[in-house]
């Protein structure tokens, strides 16, 4: 595994983070946010798709990992989040990338050591793990956390003597 694109989906702001993996080392390549400008949901979904297609073209990742949808108190928000995830997943599959998904608890555990970590704790640990000069913005930090979680899951399978492939870990269900 060489380059992982992690995505924290949102209908207004979608975070992305790209890391390169060399052995057990994680190297920061880039991160940021796709901020949608349209009020119309279909236009926002198109902006997410197009933005991720550009990022995939720029970084040429080998793996794609995304945060799993959680149950929100507001059903409308959960549906919009699911649609944003769909746009992101389509961008990945159109580029031929395998898709893996992880829950927020799995991501926080991989980055901070506890699934109940606060956003500020995640940002701080991302800064430390990737040796960044400053903490990334929240959505980008979450996306980097997704990529790190994917890498750690891969490393764990290898350490246990298993054959790691996108088909056997974090796979999309």
Swiss-Prot record:
Mg(2+) 1 binds at residues 8, 139. Mg(2+) 2 binds at residue 67. PROSITE patterns: RUVC. GO terms for biological process: DNA recombination; DNA repair. The RuvA-RuvB-RuvC complex processes Holliday junction (HJ) DNA during genetic recombination and DNA repair. Endonuclease that resolves HJ intermediates. Cleaves cruciform DNA by making single-stranded nicks across the HJ at symmetrical positions within the homologous arms, yielding a 5'-phosphate and a 3'-hydroxyl group; requires a central core of homology in the junction. The consensus cleavage sequence is 5'-(A/T)TT(C/G)-3'. Cleavage occurs on the 3'-side of the TT dinucleotide at the point of strand exchange. Homodimer which binds Holliday junction (HJ) DNA. The HJ becomes 2-fold symmetrical on binding to RuvC with unstacked arms; it has a different conformation from HJ DNA in complex with RuvA. In the full resolvosome a probable DNA-RuvA(4)-RuvB(12)-RuvC(2) complex forms which resolves the HJ. HAMAP family: RuvC. This is Crossover junction endodeoxyribonuclease RuvC. It comes from Shewanella frigidimarina (strain NCIMB 400).
């Amino acid at each position: 595994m060489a380059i992982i694109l992690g995505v924290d989906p949102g209908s207004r702001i979608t975070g992305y983070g790209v890391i390169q993996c060399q052995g057990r080392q994680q190297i920061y390549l880039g991160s940021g946010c796709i901020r949608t400008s349209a009020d119309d949901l279909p236009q926002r979904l198109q902006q997410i798709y197009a933005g991720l297609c550009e990022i995939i073209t720029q970084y040429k990742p080998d793996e794609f990992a995304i945060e799993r949808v959680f149950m929100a108190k507001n059903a409308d928000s959960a549906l919009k989040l699911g649609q944003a995830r769909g746009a992101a997943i389509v961008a990945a599959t159109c580029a031929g990338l395998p898709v893996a998904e992880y829950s927020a608890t799995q991501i926080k555990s991989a980055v901070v050591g506890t699934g109940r970590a606060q956003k500020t704790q995640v940002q701080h640990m991302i800064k430390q793990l990737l040796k960044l000069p400053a903490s990334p913005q929240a959505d980008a930090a979450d996306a980097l956390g997704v990529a790190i979680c994917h890498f750690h899951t891969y490393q764990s399978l290898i350490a246990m003597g298993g054959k790691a492939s996108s088909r056997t870990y974090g796979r999309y269900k």
